[in-house]
Amino acid sequence: MSRIGKLPIKIPANVDITCSGPDLTVKGKFGTLHNTIPDAIGIEEIDGSLIVNVKDNTRSNRALHGLYRTLINNMVTGVSEQFQLTLNLQGVGYRASVQGNSIILNLGYSHPVELVIPEGISVEVVQNTTINLKACDKGNLGLFASNIRSWRPPEPYKGKGILYKGEIVKRKAGKSGKK
């Protein structure tokens, strides 16, 4: 039995969970999330918490046990509290702004980079260099944040680029020159 998979998932009072066949729906204050649960995984609700079980104890099913427990826990957390990521733009002239349903990034290219904001993600730009992302779906939030970051990943020589909040770039020394 998986160490993570056997932990119960606490269900907050404002969250409704519906399981019809393989489809799992989680509704909360910040939205609704859907997921398909494989046949090898069973879900039961006991005393205001969800228990994720494995129907037959094969190696592949045990691998899915912890995965689906974590996915369901992230769904419950997302619809009740939301997930948040913060990106910092470090570099001369690096700026961000939100226009309608897209985010405009000035990252030192000859043209501004325009990215469409996916549905379910809210973007807020603070002081032109800090991007706050919020969403109830943790997977889509991380995917969009990594898409933004891929335009200018942090580089080790000057420390410029798009960094996650709290990320420390390991710096390298430049060329030492001719001796």
Swiss-Prot record:
Does Amino-acid biosynthesis count among this protein's keywords?
A: no
Keyword presence, Transcription: no
- On the tree of life, the source organism's domain of life is Eukaryota
Q: Which GO terms describe its molecular function?
A: rRNA binding; structural constituent of ribosome
Gene Ontology CC terms? chloroplast; ribonucleoprotein complex; ribosome
List, in alphabetical order, the GO biological process terms annotated in this UniProt record.
translation
Which PROSITE patterns does this UniProt record tie to the protein? RIBOSOMAL_L6_1 (PS00525)
Q: Which InterPro entries match?
A: Ribosomal_uL6-like, Ribosomal_uL6-like_a/b-dom_sf, Ribosomal_uL6_a/b-dom, Ribosomal_uL6_bac-type, Ribosomal_uL6_CS
Sorted UniProt keywords: Chloroplast, Plastid, Ribonucleoprotein, Ribosomal protein, RNA-binding, rRNA-binding
Where does this protein reside within or beyond the cell? Plastid, Chloroplast
According to its UniProt entry, what is the function of this protein?
Binds 23S rRNA.
Against PANTHER family, the record matches this protein to: 60S/50S RIBOSOMAL PROTEIN L6/L9, LARGE RIBOSOMAL SUBUNIT PROTEIN UL6M
The similarity comment for this entry is: Belongs to the universal ribosomal protein uL6 family.
Describe, as the record does, how this protein assembles with itself and its partners: Part of the 50S ribosomal subunit.
Report what the protein is called: Large ribosomal subunit protein uL6c
Which organism does this sequence originate in? Answer: Trieres chinensis
